[in-house]
Amino acid sequence: MIDVAIIDSGINMTDTDICSMVSKGFSIDYSDGNTVYQNEYNDLNGHGTYCASIIRRFCPDVKLTIIKILDQCKMGRSECLIEALHYLYHNPVDVISMSLSTQDNQYEKELGIICKKIEESGMIMVSSLANHAEISYPAVYEGVIGVKGALFLEEKEYIYHPDRVIQCQGSSIPVLVEGVDGTYTFFGGNSKAAANISGIIASLLQKFGMTDDFGALFKEYSCHTKKNEQTLTISSIINSNVTISGELCEEKDFKKLITIMQNVLEIPMRKSQLIFECSILHPELNIDKKNFGKLIKEIEREWKIHFRKEEVNLLSIRDITTIYSLLKRTEKYESNQK
């Protein structure tokens, strides 16, 4: 079984599915000039739990080592990151996933030294680039697979250029995840892209094992990606037009979906026509990831279904027709499972 270490904000201890995958877990804090280990790694923010759930989507049988260094506000200290990496150097895993970064170069040399030692030991390190930045650590180190987000048609797609400073691009399209308070939200950006890449690497290791030149294998699989940079843009998603047939407008469930959207998203009557004309991400509708998550939760409650979270992202639910299609597809899937 592949062992992935996640250095982040911990995991939600009430999520029994993810907790069942944890082989060991602890937190590292900083106090009075020293790093302190504690047998507590409950996620107070949700970020680490999101990363674990993403990795699990690609590699369901993965074993997790959880190291909590980020607090409720997703803040942490470089000293704790360095200590976590030293721990993993002496207690090896297969993949180290770090959906985090620092732009403080105070510990650049010390962080670089331990990353080099880990690389030479054969472990694979993945780190996200800081959002909206060109340089952050440890993503820029030669022995670390630095990841930044991009728009891909499928979650499994990625691009790998080992000769570049930031070697990898993964899908940053926000996907549905469950928060530590049980509500739904969307998780995207470079952090999500790095979790995607960590999960993909874990699945490849599970399938092929650690080869002498894993980089070549990783590069080969990236060649299957078909990226459409010209047509797949945030602008095209937001400004996409919606075509709705008259027959669909008369469908009972479709009418109910419209009512739920208007109520949950608090769309005023004067703007309700936008639901039928464009993406529900249109700026005039003022939809954010929190009330978008409430919408998904309410649809599940009303139809007594459970969406498969890996199917729900801002491409699959970009407008009312795609939400309706996903709803009907989920109904059919759950009916066939009975």
Name each model-derived stretch.
Residues I2, D8, D17, E134-Q206:
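Extracellular S/T/G-rich loop segment that most often corresponds to the catalytic His/Ser-adjacent loop
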Residues M1-F58, V62:
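Active-site core segment of subtilase-fold serine proteases
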Residues G209-T231:
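An often Trp-containing, charged/polar helix-loop segment at the C-terminal end
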Residues C223-K338:
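Phosphopantetheine-dependent thiolation modules in NRPS/PKS and related acyl-activating systems
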Residues S97-S101, S128, G149, A195:
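A cross-family glycoside hydrolase active-site/sugar-binding cleft signature
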Residues Y37-Q103:
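Subtilisin-like peptidase catalytic core
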Residues T65, I124-V126:
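Structural detector of well-ordered beta-strand residues that form the stable sheet scaffold
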Residues M1, G76-S97, E108-S121, H132-G146, ...:
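Mature extracellular/periplasmic domains of secretome proteins
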